[in-house]
Design a protein with these regions (language model features):
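Membrane-interface anchor segments at the N-terminal boundary of transmembrane helices
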Residues: 100-118, 339-425
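Basic, ligand-binding patches in group-transfer machinery
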Residues: 491, 495-626
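Transmembrane-helix motifs of polytopic, lipid-linked glycan transferases
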Residues: 111-132, 170
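Short hydrophobic/aromatic helix or loop-helix immediately within or flanking a transmembrane segment
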Residues: 63-103, 110
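Specific aromatic-rich, kink-prone transmembrane helix
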Residues: 163-183, 200
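Membrane-interface alpha helices of multi-pass inner-membrane proteins
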Residues: 191-207, 219
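Membrane-proximal stem/loop segments at transmembrane-domain junctions that anchor or position
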Residues: 43-78, 252-364
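Perimembrane helix-loop-helix junctions
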Residues: 2-5, 213-241
Length: 626
């Protein structure tokens, strides 16, 4: 048996070395690899005064086509600063830039983050070293999940996603070490609890949407410590409450961010998902005029100024939105259902990942780096949508099964490391998904829910690895772990199968189409034939796109045209899992006679192949009078 333990320990160390190799290969590559800035990196730049080394007029703009390697010190912009634990890592790069004449290669920032990851992995390995199966599971997660390019491409950036992944990784590992200790009737080591609290603070302050995530992770630990260390448990609960209060109420947020998020959630997600938008708007305290902007987002205001059509939504409190969702749970469920297909984009192809190459994605990264850059993200993104729907539904089943197992075992005073790990991972994933949609609607939902991808991947790794626990040790505990893993697999598959059937039926009935009308750009137009152009997608496929006017005129659009974004990029980069995405453009023309009365209400309707009709745009067109 000691010989077997030594072999397992060596394998675990080798896996950590493999993960380190994968990380270093990506962050040190030439040309530089990292996700390009679609604008949000500007918020961390504003905090620390570190900007892309481009013309001054270009520094504040988005550069989503490709990442920029060189950064320079510049002015801080406190009013635009997004306070996050990401600033801690960025500050190191700023200090090095100060030493080297004010410029720094962003790979230096990547090296700082990689060092933090490796030190954390080695410390956690030492913590788990007395439990070979735990050490091996942790090493597998580090090598396969943390070392996956879909995660390591965040290192050479100023995005907040890295700090979320880093602190979630450490927090969940420490949760298992604390709450699944062998003797639950003895206190957890105080130093371990303090480190756990620090990691929870780092996680809670990584992104505003994670203000309650530390509470989800900390509750099992606090419960397990309740009897032998009541004061430590209370202290942990005080910490997570303080995180929520500070993040939600104390840290300043730029008014533009608040307004944009409100528009994307209320107008872009909640009202379109409601069966009675007028009643929902009334419950939110919005005037009926706001219904004219239903379906609008901050970036696509449907030809209007939202300050004039619906100023009330811009300053709406999140408390009012939360109260509405509690009052209309079916609306909340439809919001989640409508965003479900977009969660399959693990690849994030709309963010270029290679310096000086336009929208180069995972395949191009692998061509630069080789085997260390093999990623699960393209594989998941390319899955048949029905299979992805089943797998994601199964993760929800796994969350329910693991939560029940945790409650049962903790009530009996038994250690439950597998159930705890699965609960924390799937719970964190679904927390990220829910808060992404109700935090910023469907705008970049796959990126805002990015934490879900590594958590679900890690849950799959832990679950499969646990099936082979008897190979690590022949004791009764390993056999129980294998049986428990098989039980979790069976339960999640059964629940996932049932839920995916319900989802498939619901998707046939609920309006699921997405799309944009990008012309006309203004709703005040000449009294002449008026062309509507844009794109439309639907999970079952688009059968037709129609313009419907308030005088009952119906104009069929020509659908199936090529479509390119504002920078000439393919729509597939944003919505890779939808059918017909390479020919999703449409064009329709309203005759001049339709504008004869001066004003005209026009709705753009997408007809799915299942027959469901979805409104994607509504406008009040006003003809100019000369």
């Amino acid at each position: 048996m000691p010989e077997r333990k030594r072999i397992v320990a060596l394998v675990a160390v080798a896996l950590i070395a493999l993960g380190a190799w994968r990380i270093v290969a990506v962050i040190s590559a030439t040309p530089m690899l990292g996700y390009a800035n679609q604008f949000d990196m500007r918020r961390i730049s504003a905090c620390v005064g570190l900007w892309p080394d481009v013309a001054a007029s270009e520094r504040l703009r988005a550069h989503p086509e490709a990442p920029i390697a060189r950064y320079v010190r510049g002015e801080r912009r406190p009013d635009e600063c997004y306070i996050s634990t990401e600033v801690v890592f960025a500050a190191g790069a700023v200090a090095i830039a100060a030493i080297h004449g004010g410029t720094v290669d962003v790979r230096v920032l990547g090296a700082i983050k990689a060092t933090a990851l490796l030190l954390a992995a080695l410390a956690l390995h030492a913590l788990f070293s007395r439990k070979p199966s735990w050490a091996l599971a942790h090493a597998l997660v580090f090598a396969l999940v943390i070392g996956d390019p879909s995660n390591t491409l965040w290192l050479n950036t100023l995005y907040t996603e890295f700090s979320a992944v880093f602190f979630a990784y450490v927090s969940i590992a420490l949760l298992v070490a604390i709450a699944a200790r062998e003797a639950l009737d003895t206190p957890a080591r105080p130093r371990l609890v303090r480190l756990f609290a620090v990691s929870l603070v780092g996680l809670g302050l990584s992104r505003q949407q994670h203000f309650l995530l530390p509470a989800l992770i900390a509750l099992p630990a606090a419960y397990s410590m309740g009897r032998p260390a009541r004061h430590a448990a209370i202290g942990l609960l005080v910490v997570v409450c303080a995180i929520a209060i500070v993040q939600f109420a104390a840290l300043p947020r730029h008014p533009t961010i608040i307004s944009a998020n409100n528009v994307d959630v209320v107008l872009g997600a909640i009202l379109p998902a409601s069966k009675d938008p007028a009643a929902t708007a009334e419950r939110l305290g919005l005037p009926r005029l706001c219904l004219q902007s239903m379906g609008a987002t901050w970036y696509e205001p449907m030809g209007e100024s939202l300050e004039s059509t619906c100023p009330e939504v811009l300053a709406m409190s999140r408390g009012r939105i939360a109260a509405l969702l509690l009052r209309e749970p079916m609306t909340a469920l439809r919001v989640l259902l409508r965003g479900w297909p977009q969660l399959q984009d693990w690849r994030l192809g709309y963010l270029g990942a290679i310096e000086r190459q336009r929208f180069a994605g995972a395949e191009a990264v692998r061509a630069v780096v080789g085997p260390p850059a093999v990623s699960v993200a393209p594989w998941v993104t390319a899955l048949p949508p029905a299979l992805f729907r089943f797998l994601l539904a199964s993760s929800l089943g796994l969350l329910a099964a693991s939560a029940c197992a945790c409650l049962r075992d903790m009530a009996r005073g038994r250690s439950a490391p597998l159930a705890l790990a699965l609960f924390a991972l799937t719970g964190s994933a679904w927390y990220a998904i829910v808060t992404a949609m109700f935090g910023d609607g469907y705008v970049e939902v796959s990126r805002h829910a990015q934490l879900a991808a590594p958590c679900l991947y890690a849950a799959a790794v832990v679950l499969v690895a646990s099936l082979f626990a008897p190979l690590v040790s022949f004791d009764i505990r390993s056999r129980r772990t294998a049986f428990a893993s098989a039980g979790f697999l069976a339960a999640s598959a059964a629940l996932g199968g049932l839920l995916s059937m319900v989802l498939s039926t619901a998707m046939e009935r609920v309006p699921m189409a997405i799309g944009v009308v990008d012309r006309p750009t203004r709703n005040i137009v000449p009294a002449a034939p008026l062309e509507f152009t844009g794109w439309a997608l639907e999970p079952s496929g688009v059968a037709a796109v129609e313009l419907v006017t308030d005088d009952q005129r119906l104009v069929a659009a020509r659908y199936g045209l090529p479509y390119a974004g504002a920078r000439g990029e393919a729509l597939r980069l944003y919505f890779p899992s939808y059918p017909d995405v390479d020919a999703a453009g449409f064009v329709a023309e309203l005759p001049a006679v339709a504008l004869a009365k001066g004003t005209l209400d026009v709705r753009t309707i997408v007809v799915a192949k299942t027959g469901t009709r979805t409104e994607i745009d509504r406008r009040r067109i006003v003809a100019e009078r000369h």
